[in-house]
């Protein structure tokens, strides 16, 4: 009997340890420092940081529904209400959004950039990969609509987790959201993405690790992995979506975007970049990326004339 109790105790201890460790890795994923991001972006030819410091911009702070502040910048040099909101990826911050900011500014659009919860200057204790972030994005969109007096077009560009956030937001705000979306390298389902990363990084099976981690994720973070699923809401999105992914992405497979594109009804476009790893489609394919985005934006402008 004593051996049985010891075995049960050891099993319970192991389950708790697994749950705490893996849920901690998800909720408190290590973030890049400003120095890391600046070095990476500069090494990749994005010399945008000094110009941002000198650029005229308006800082903003808005309260999240979850009790922290969301911080960002509105950059509006053009005489137009048309604006792109840029959502950065996990572990990043607004510094990673600057290359996209310059792309859209060059194309004649104003830009709003901000830090997701637990990233950059924004508050928040945990990362939820789009689950809570989509509601913060709703606050940002409302701020922008008030700034522009509900005039002009609003588009949302997201990279990686930012793309997931944009799609989850779009699925929840079909009639009162943005006018269009650009989703660059999103995952289709978070539980599938976690299973994929477990195999790729640790050579570990998803069972029983993921069910245990998922229980603790709900306990500690308030959400389950299956609740973070663009694929589950993509058929609700009526507004146009441009999907982007590099074919050689080995962090989030290109098949994720292909599945989302296939299931999306209504206006949509797909650009599979020839070069670049995860979240590097613009960096490694600047001309074709810009051309694809410009054509998509031109279609948005034409549809409102």
Swiss-Prot record:
<keyword id="KW-0472">Membrane</keyword>
<dbReference type="InterPro" id="IPR029058">
    <property type="entry name" value="AB_hydrolase_fold"/>
</dbReference>
<dbReference type="GO" id="GO:0016020">
    <property type="term" value="C:membrane"/>
</dbReference>
<feature type="transmembrane region" description="Helical">
    <location>
        <begin position="8"/>
        <end position="28"/>
    </location>
</feature>
<dbReference type="Pfam" id="PF12146">
    <property type="entry name" value="Hydrolase_4"/>
</dbReference>
<dbReference type="InterPro" id="IPR022742">
    <property type="entry name" value="Hydrolase_4"/>
</dbReference>
<dbReference type="InterPro" id="IPR052920">
    <property type="entry name" value="DNA-binding_regulatory"/>
</dbReference>
<keyword id="KW-0812">Transmembrane</keyword>
<protein>
    <recommendedName>
        <fullName>Uncharacterized protein YqkD</fullName>
    </recommendedName>
</protein>
<keyword id="KW-1133">Transmembrane helix</keyword>
